[in-house]
């Protein structure tokens, strides 16, 4: 009997043979039979489709009929377009497969093609999504099996029994604790996107050689340091108009022999000591305007100030070097020559300060760069006797990083500007060390009453 032949009741003969439950028949068994028939017909249809796709005769017949009434040019264009579309769709269907998977690795739940390691198991996208939805929405209590929990789960039957599918997910080892709720999932996705964007920016910067500029947080730090410097820097940018030159006859007649071949002019020395106290006070005020410095213990603050005071005063004098008059302006008010500073008590230290001033004149530093140099000198963690060494080192690193990024922002046209500028920190540290040695000789050779109390307090050990 063919499928199209009819019975007396007008029904197909194959339909008549289909079992129909009586009132007392077990509905559960009938349901199982219908499910099996459904699966069988589904598999048969898939098999037929597969044979249909792979049959060379069918492909040839279909191709011939589709181009029978087309011009040769149309055939070429449409065949190329069809091939390209097929390749594109094929790529979409394949999707992304991680490199750690074997070529044809299967889902441990249903046997479909696996796409990755999901919730501690290698699964397909379908089982991953089913497991995630079940946990997120707490659906598993509502699942029930019609066949006593004995369903076989494969890629054909996986959608027919949720309870058995979920039980198999648990059995193979999928972890419920790894499923995130909506808020955590969104936060994780946001974090992943931010990290991707960050890596993208870093790669872009590397590719085009772009140097990072200050972040918002670093700009706040830079602003604080700059304001502290401007507020404590005597005369500011008007120092040239307000300076007064030390008379030429002062500092030219040495009257006290000092060690190391230097001379001390007591008149010049007395002039310098008059401006030294306000100069030291301004350095202390600069430090106290920095929140990081104020957070340190009092003992560490004193050690840092005593260590950097001469270095910062030398820097402030060096950036006010005037090549026309060949003078340095001390504390924003007194312009002195190299000889006057040397004979006034500093000896060879004056040469180092003048050489630094001549060198820095080509750097064209602004107030912010001078301020950041001072902050780096202040937060030197290698000063003897410090308690919070790691903390101070961290603070200096913050200043250095902000400083470097600010240099990038300024875009100086000096080759290797940043490393050259860092070398000036070394020069200033050397000046501080030389002055400490020179101070001992000055105490021996000069009358004690000429030394201001603050000068002695800062530079005496």
From Swiss-Prot:
Keywords on record: DNA-binding, Metal-binding, Nucleus, Receptor, Transcription, Transcription regulation, Zinc, Zinc-finger
Subcellular location: Nucleus
Any single GO CC term annotated in Swiss-Prot or TrEMBL for this entry: nucleus
DNA-binding region residue numbers: 107-181
Residues noted as binding Zn(2+) 1 in the record, renumbered to the chain: 107, 110, 124, 127
S-S bonds: none
Region listing for Interaction with NR2F6, in residue ranges: 244-461
Family: Belongs to the nuclear hormone receptor family. NR1 subfamily.
PANTHER family documented for this protein: NUCLEAR HORMONE RECEPTOR, THYROID HORMONE RECEPTOR BETA
Record note on quaternary structure: Binds DNA as a dimer; homodimer and heterodimer with RXRB. Interacts with the coactivators NCOA1/SRC1, NCOA2/GRIP1, NCOA7 and MED1/TRAP220 in a ligand-inducible manner. Interacts with the corepressor NCOR1 in absence of ligand. Interacts with C1D. Interacts with NR2F6; the interaction impairs the binding of the THRB homodimer and THRB:RXRB heterodimer to T3 response elements. Interacts with PRMT2 and THRSP. Interacts with TACC1; this interaction is decreased in the presence of thyroid hormone T3.
Descriptive protein name: Thyroid hormone receptor beta
Native species: Mus musculus
Lineage: Eukaryota, Metazoa, Chordata, Craniata, Vertebrata
